[in-house]
Amino acid sequence: MSLYDDLGVETSDSKTEGWSKNFKLLQSQLQVKKAALTQAKSQRTKQSTVLAPVIDLKRGGSSDDRQIVDTPPHVAAGLKDPVPSGFSAGEVLIPLADEYDPMFPNDYEKVVKRQREERQRQRELERQKEIEEREKRRKDRHEASGFARRPDPDSDEDEDYERERRKRSMGGAAIAPPTSLVEKDKELPRDFPYEEDSRPRSQSSKAAIPPPVYEEQDRPRSPTGPSNSFLANMGGTVAHKIMQKYGFREGQGLGKHEQGLSTALSVEKTSKRGGKIIVGDATEKDASKKSDSNPLTEILKCPTKVVLLRNMVGAGEVDEDLEVETKEECEKYGKVGKCVIFEIPGAPDDEAVRIFLEFERVESAIKAVVDLNGRYFGGRVVKACFYNLDKFRVLDLAEQV
């Protein structure tokens, strides 16, 4: 007895397991189909009967005159295409007469084309019907009704449509002139022929009417006088009236104090969508004020290691903790070497007390000046600047800054 006798030995069929099963199934199907065909042929030959020729024995005469009528063999009905008894009609092996064959042409394309044409025809009919209804509504809208030949009052929708169309076609509304100009217009004398033409005829007009265009020889002339050249330059009496409304008089200068304007007006932006008009001289003053109010750029031109702080405390407010607190506060900008507090007697309150801070690096001093200048401390605005290092070391602390 061997050591491996109890183990199953694999047969050679497992090696061809991937294709042998399908091949065996095909062979079995072919055998079944062949058996069905042979069985049907044998049954057809057994059940078909052939009758003998018919001989008419009643008629007299010789045997040569006898007529033999041959009739075709009679085949029993229903046995032409027998169905094998071993298979049902629903099995796959039985060939069907209407079985679908993808290689055989069918009417699918014709059916799809017919349905597409039908949908297109239906769509065209709906579109034509909609056009006819629209034309009918348009005719009914313009058609008059009643004895007075007035439009039908029930067509509210048509009236709304006409109203909207009228609003769209109408131009922008003109703004009525101010009442002050109208009042001054009434006060003007009647001996000016051009005044009557330029007067607004109706304030309720919906659209602005352009001025009439004249040839050079037909243009109305303004009256002769000392202000004729000015009126010609100002473009007519309308501009003259506007200037008079804002206080212009012949021979006087423009401006609040009649000083005249030597520079053009400028506009200063105050917000995202707002601004104000500034006279040229005022712009120069504002620019100088801005340069004076922000002298930080001037301070940073000559940096040193010594920072001078003014207006931190008033005269007589210096205590023992001020030096320590100031030094600790300025340690965040860099290492502070020395802190000195000096008070000038008889000086103004914002210049009386000076606090000097000596940093080890110039960069730390610059950070301190940028951060402390303009900062609020105890209700006061701190003034920070640089101080000469040599004068600080010899304790010359009262120099004018």
Swiss-Prot record:
Region (Disordered): 57-84, 114-233
Keyword field: Acetylation, Isopeptide bond, mRNA processing, mRNA splicing, Nucleus, Phosphoprotein, RNA-binding, Spliceosome, Ubl conjugation
GO BP field: alternative mRNA splicing, via spliceosome; mRNA cis splicing, via spliceosome
Annotated GO CC locations: nucleoplasm; spliceosomal complex
InterPro entries: G_patch_dom, Nucleotide-bd_a/b_plait_sf, RBD_domain_sf, RBM17, RRM_dom, RRM_dom_euk, SPF45_RRM
Residue stretches making up the RRM domain: 306-385
Positions of post-translational Phosphothreonine modification: T71, T237
Phosphoserine: modified positions: S2, S155, S169, S222, S266, S291, S293
Pfam families given in the database record: G-patch, RRM_1
Keyword Ribonucleoprotein: no
Gene Ontology molecular functions: RNA binding
Keyword Nucleus: yes
Residue span, G-patch domain: 235-283
Compositionally biased spans, kind Basic and acidic residues: 57-68, 114-153, 182-200
Result, substituting R375A: Impairs interaction with SF3B1, SF1 and U2AF2. Abolishes regulation of alternative splicing
Modified residues (N6-acetyllysine): K21, K41
Function summary: Splice factor that binds to the single-stranded 3'AG at the exon/intron border and promotes its utilization in the second catalytic step. Involved in the regulation of alternative splicing and the utilization of cryptic splice sites. Promotes the utilization of a cryptic splice site created by the beta-110 mutation in the HBB gene. The resulting frameshift leads to sickle cell anemia.
PANTHER family according to UniProt: SPLICING FACTOR 45 (PTHR13288:SF8), SPLICING FACTOR 45 SPF45 (PTHR13288)
Binding partners and assembly: Binds SXL. Associates with the spliceosome. Interacts with SF3B1, SF1 and U2AF2.
Identification of the protein by name: Splicing factor 45
The organism of origin for this protein: Homo sapiens (Human)
